[in-house]
Amino acid sequence: MLVLRRAVIRRLRLLWKALGRSGGRLLTQGALTVALIAGALGLAVYAVPHAGPDWAYGEETEPVADSEQDDDPPLAVPPGVDAIPCVPAGPAPGSTTDPNSDMDSRLKAWADNLAHVGISPRALQAYGNAEIVLAGVKPQCHLSWTTLAGIGSVETNHGTTGGTSLGADGRPVEQIRGPALDGTNNNKRIPDTDGGEYDGDTKFDRAVGPMQFIPQTWERWKADGDGDGVSDPNDIDDVAVAAGHYLCADGRDLSRAADWYAAVFAYNHLDSYVRDVYARADEYGKKSRSR
């Protein structure tokens, strides 16, 4: 398991104590991303970008060792820490008033109803399906579609980076591949591990698909999210479920601030990455309440 840095844990504890002294407000368990994370990451005021980067943040980094020196100064409680980030409103993915409709129809209707949040219905169906799947196999994780959407936005703008779009089958019309992980441009050097099977590169690995899995990570976490018998890192249904399993690993409960932070930080070891995912997940939660 990737080790959550002691500095972050200390900051979360400081914020929790501060909240206890600030009028006794209680944070609801139902919050997807609770106010402690906002405070720890300085998200009281945050400019939210509306488009994904040209490429993913890049690659997995080495796990942080327990012995790593912690020289971070104590964190002052930032303004706005009492604000609770918005959580999804309305019916859960797949819910319906028509008991005779199949799950695909339910997910489509649910996604169509949330088109105003700024995510294509096809991507929303994948995120909603992943929430349903993980709720069934790892109910203690409390994974929400908004966390997956936050990651999908940062990684590839929901499978549309570079001007492509998602097809009806959930695959980008043009494949999405990150730069070669050859040790240049601050990327980790990862020689080819898949013979080019997933990323088309027989010299170095590349991040692949809507959620930018690198081949060796995909081999461990691959999933068949749409039941077509194929686990495809280019299929948003498959990668959304795989990402859900990755985030929920090691018994994490994403309704807890520290676990949510650890999960997203494990996906990419950058504080700026966690801030971006948080901001976009929070934005989608707020927009889901706007109608």
Question: PLM ranges: what are they?
Answer:
Residues 1, 40-42, 74:
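Acidic/proline-rich low-complexity IDRs
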Residues 1-26:
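Terminal targeting segments of Actinobacterial cell-envelope proteins
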Residues 4-8, 38, 50, 201:
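N-terminal targeting/disorder module
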Residues 29-45:
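Hydrophobic membrane-insertion alpha-helices, especially the h-region
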Residues 43-56:
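Hydrophobic single-pass membrane-insertion segments
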Residues 53-135:
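N-terminal export signals and maturation junctions of secreted/periplasmic proteins
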Residues 106-291:
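Catalytic glycan-binding domains that act on GlcNAc-containing polysaccharides
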